[in-house]
A protein has these predicted regions:
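Accessory RNA-recognition modules of RNA-modification enzymes
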Residues: 1-207
Length: 207
């Protein structure tokens, strides 16, 4: 759908929801301000679930609509160009280290999700690997395999989530390599960002 039509539809949705209230208050619904140019490569945070793919393989990508099935994805136009490569590299590193993917139905396995944050104004890249266990076997080898495949990553953190939940992140973080945080600049301010920090996923639109 062309971006101009997306914006028009959003404008119509807001008007349908709030139009009567705005009119009652004698207010004005201003035109939605969209991004400059086409909305591609704008998401500086990306996440993926992992699942068994048979014969020791691991798949990652996006959930199919209305289904727990994961559709593999090698690239996503909405995300920072670095993001999907890094998320896929985690899956390949887990395969090399024989780290099993999480099974939602059984609640077994290790690798649940990964979340990557890519700097907008810096080259920092924070990777958070979400596991179903507190202690990884030979974490150093796992980290080395990720770094070999994705040298742009500047820090790797393990997040522990052992709950049977749809929430991606748990409450415990263990830094596996690097500072455990990243830094980015937005609107003239420098932010230190951790695995659970709220930060704008679309910095260009924010500015």
């Amino acid at each position: 759908v062309p971006y101009t039509i997306q914006l028009r539809r959003k404008q119509e949705q807001v008007k349908d929801l709030l139009g009567a209230m705005i009119a009652a208050d004698k207010g004005e619904l201003r035109q939605i301000v969209g991004m400059k140019g086409e909305p591609i490569s704008y998401r500086h945070k990306a996440a993926t679930p992992y699942a068994h793919a048979g014969r020791g393989r691991i798949t990652c990508g996006f959930y199919a609509r209305g289904s727990p099935r994961i559709v593999s994805c090698n690239d996503c136009l909405a995300e920072d160009p670095r993001a999907r490569h890094i998320l896929n590299a985690v899956g390949r590193a887990a395969e090399l280290q024989h780290i099993p993917a999480y099974d939602e139905d059984k609640g077994t396995g290790v690798l649940r999700h990964a979340v990557v944050r890519c700097g907008y104004a810096t080259d920092d890249v924070l990777l958070t690997v979400v596991t179903n266990v507190a202690q990884l076997r030979q974490p150093g080898r796992f980290v080395s395999a990720i770094r070999d495949a994705a040298p742009e990553v500047t820090s790797i953190v393990q997040n522990v989530n052992t709950r049977r939940t749809n929430a991606i992140l748990g409450f415990t973080n263990n830094t596996l390599w690097g500072p455990g945080t990243m830094r980015d600049k937005l609107l003239g301010c420098t932010f230190e960002i951790g695995p659970t920090t709220f930060y704008q996923t679309n910095p260009a639109q924010t500015e």
